[in-house]
Regions:
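Extended accessory regions or peripheral subdomains of proteins
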Residues: 1-44, 49-87, 125, 129-226
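Short acidic (Asp/Glu) patches
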Residues: 91-109, 133-146
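Short, flexible active-site-proximal loops enriched in glycine and acidic residues
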Residues: 105-113, 200-206
């Protein structure tokens, strides 16, 4: 755990992000139960690592309340960084993404999983065009997803819950912006996360109704469109 003196030292060393951690006693919780407690937050995710085929890795990583994002559609990039939204054209979206993400620097701390904050998301199949010029020159095909599915979408994870599957322990992390949060304010953010996941789950007993009549399924694509 970082002390106040270490926090100030890291901030003075030009680190823009300082990870603060706290191990909490959440006996009986699982990655799924922890995720259910934050699932109503904005932009959430649960990452499970796998090593060597079917063998589960050590950590389950839960992120939530992700505010910053990078969205790439064609050569148009939309960003929301520190509450400021922008949209601009880029001839090289991958370089633009690298330029944005490289602005954040954080110290390497012992006892942390390999991922404890940063950008997560997806690179769609079509994003290969940004790295391979031959693909970019191919004629574009119409797609039902084209209007609402970007080629790249990344969100910045600053608040995380790390569940250790080997030790059955829970660690919470707040990646503090050293220019916006003091040490005391960062500890208060950890307090909020701890309170959130220690809140008991409310289980509703829904009365399910048996469907009447036959169910008809319809594909979103015709065979010709596929």
């Amino acid at each position: 755990m970082i002390t106040k003196e270490e926090y100030i030292e890291y901030a003075d060393s030009a680190y823009s992000i300082i990870p603060l951690t706290r191990e909490i006693d959440n006996a009986g919780d699982t990655p799924i139960s922890l995720y259910s407690k934050i699932s109503d937050q904005q932009n959430t995710f649960l990452l499970e690592s796998v090593e060597g085929g079917n063998r589960w890795a050590q950590f389950s990583i839960i992120g939530f309340d992700c505010q910053d994002y990078i969205k790439v559609s064609g050569n148009q990039i939309e960003t929301c960084l520190d509450g400021v939204s922008k949209s601009f054209h880029s001839d090289d979206p991958l370089s633009s993404i690298q330029k944005i993400t490289s602005q954040d620097t954080a110290p390497e701390l012992e006892g942390m999983p390999r991922f404890y904050g940063g950008y997560v998301g997806f690179f769609a199949y079509e994003s290969a065009q940004y790295a391979e010029t031959k693909i970019a020159k191919l004629a574009s095909k119409n797609s039902k997803f084209k209007d609402h599915m970007p080629e790249i979408y990344l969100i910045k994870a600053e608040k995380l819950i790390i569940f250790d599957n080997f030790a059955s322990t829970t660690k919470i992390i707040f990646n503090a912006n050293s220019k916006k949060f003091s040490y005391t304010e960062s500890q208060k953010e950890l307090d909020k996360i701890e309170k959130l996941i220690k809140h008991p789950i409310t289980i509703t007993n829904d009365n399910f109704k048996k469907p009447t009549g036959s169910l008809e399924f319809k594909s979103n694509f015709t065979k010709a469109e596929y």
